[in-house]
Amino acid sequence: MKKIECIILDWAGTAVDYGCFAPVAAFIESFNEIGVPVTAAETRAYMGLTKIEEIRALFNIDRVKVAFREKFGRDYTDEDVQARYVAFQRVLFDTLENYSEPIPGVVDTVEALHKAGIKIGSTTGY
């Protein structure tokens, strides 16, 4: 039987911030900053897209399009998408520590893997 040499852990949204609350909060806040709110349900509907594509998708929600047009007197542009992406990143990294608690057992598991000489790789969506 072959020995396990390496495992890959998905951190954000799985081993840490189980449920992906950090990006949801960052999307909500980045849109609130311009007075065009989005909901948690709306942000969750597009999870799995890249963050910039999710922002585009949020801007394309009819209610959000109307709110943006009423607020700014025009349709959104790619510059608006880019600006919300920059805002999203800023908010995410400013608040990430609030969502950094590992799920129960992760720290002990990582320590046990290290002691067993098993390498750990990482992946994350944020």
Where do the language-model regions lie?
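N-terminal helical cap/lid subdomain that shapes the substrate entry/recognition surface
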Residues: K2-V107, H114-K119
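Conserved phosphate-coupling serine/threonine residues in phosphotransfer and NTP-handling enzymes
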Residues: T124-Y126
